[in-house]
Amino acid sequence: TEPKNLEEQAISLVGTDIYEKLIKGYTQKQWGRPCNELPSFIIKRLPVRLTFDNNYFNALYQGIPEGGYTKMVANMLNDSELSGSIEVRLGVDYLASADAKEELDSQAEKVVYTGAIDAYFDYKLGNLEYRSVRFETETLDTPNFQGNAAVNYTDAETPWTRIIEHKWFEFGKDENGDDLPKTVISREYSSEWKPGDEPYYPVNDEKNGALYAQYK
């Protein structure tokens, strides 16, 4: 029979031992719900390999922009060939009012809205459920905290889901190639979204999927 929920799907993929050690606690922290109440397709997106390849993606070449994505976008906006042709407005709420939306819509033939679909329709069918994330950032007086950019904490007892050590996204060196004497870490806490919070990702269960389909 087909797995009916995430727990059954995970056990069928990796067995009970790995499920209990690596998946159950982390998943329930991330989603705030028991694994047997989450749909099976959530776990299907994760690659399962019986090799030493620890990459998430299968692409031959993988990387991040040098200096980060903020610098990449800034360079694109400052390109001499595009200078003056790209207007950037910050702190603008597209949905603040009908007049604001109409004014912004008039700026282009096509508008791409990347916000929440229920907010776009003014919650006429009700609120979708989301998860939010809180970051606790700390500067440590050590050149190395965990030796890796991201370490997941898969147990249920640790309140954070993972710790990011930012320097390792840039190989831990300064502009001269020297080791950095300090390091910055961020603990990541997953939490239930409420109005006023930033929604990071939707809750992909049957109830929310049905409401999302109505909004579409």
Q: How should each PLM-predicted stretch be described?
A:
Residues 1-109:
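Active-site/ligand-binding neighborhood in enzyme catalytic cores
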Residues 92-215:
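Mid-domain catalytic core of redox enzymes
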